Amino acid sequence: MRKTIHIAFCIDNAFAIHLAALIHSLGKHLSQNFQLKCHILGRLNEDNIFKLTSLTSQNIKVGFYDDFPDYKEIPISSLYNNRLNEVTYYRFAIPEVLHNVEKVVFIDADMIAIGDISTLWSIDMMDSIVAVVSDHILGCDKEKQQVRGISSGRYFNAGFMLMDLGKWRENNISQQALKLLIDNNGFEHNDQDALNIVLQNKVLYLDEKWNAQPNHLAKKDISEPVLVHFCGQEKPWHVYCVHPFKDSYLVSRAETAYACEPLQTYLDQDDMDILSRLKNKFPDGARIVVWGAGQRGRRLCYEIIRNMDKYSIEYIIDKGVSGEFMGVEINHRLVKVAGIDAVIIASIPYRDEIIDEISEGSCLVCI
């Protein structure tokens, strides 16, 4: 008889397609001695329920839950309000919705399985309430941890948690975290901040392979990730995404009922402001250079090349990247200025430095 691993997910209709890819990948890599009981919290339409139910197999069982608070009274940080909504707070309902379950793995839907998660189920959590992985960025920011009232020196990413639901309920973790969020009118990193405050010194830190985030992968700290987390703005379902495990997501999705769905584009408010300034300054078109081949630079290049035919990108500048993107050459510096109307600065944190560098040798307009 197969042992059961309980897994909880919190989604809305927009993320059903990505959850399908995740669940399929979990089942594909799972040991034959186990089965997954997938608990999906979300107010989903009939089409998505039907498609997710089609994932059912010998080692995958699927259940749906929608009887829990909507959490709409809790604000979302301005840092995330263009890509997150109240669904991020649904995880607080897991212990009560799954009142007969004592242990569950919570996994964000923007992840993909590369290996077998079954060994996770046998981890001895000792007295810990959750087992987690350090956040790839905030885990190193001790100053911000202190500001948040976290004295443990550790900060975890809440997109993956092995939860002891018995201890969670006994310690009223959801209630404590929700009270903190309400009393503080939200936090910069929403539920993740609240959980790090409430759970400090009550967590077991695991190897990064269980929640392999971009900086972990960039540093090559992980030889064989089990769960890859596409955290951040750029996702593998974006047409311009560059990620070492993008294909793992696409292959898994292609084997689900969502196989024919197209890839997506995404622009945040800063992207739209940059493009608006470009159009206002050069309404009849322009020859431009894009400075920065990172996520924002790729988004802007894609939008300009595909949807703004009056504007041409002559080349891209990035001191850390070589090659090309969408047929546009990437250089390490300004290589020619003649005929260029403007430079779009996609590396916003370094905008002032870049403007100073451009101003030294040219009179180009900086957007």
Located regions from the model:
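Short, acidic, metal-binding catalytic loop of nucleotide-sugar glycosyltransferases
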Residues: 25-33
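A short, conserved beta-to-alpha structural element at the edge of catalytic cores
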Residues: 130-150, 234-254, 258, 319-321
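Conserved beta-strand elements of the Class I
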Residues: 6-8, 105, 204, 287-291
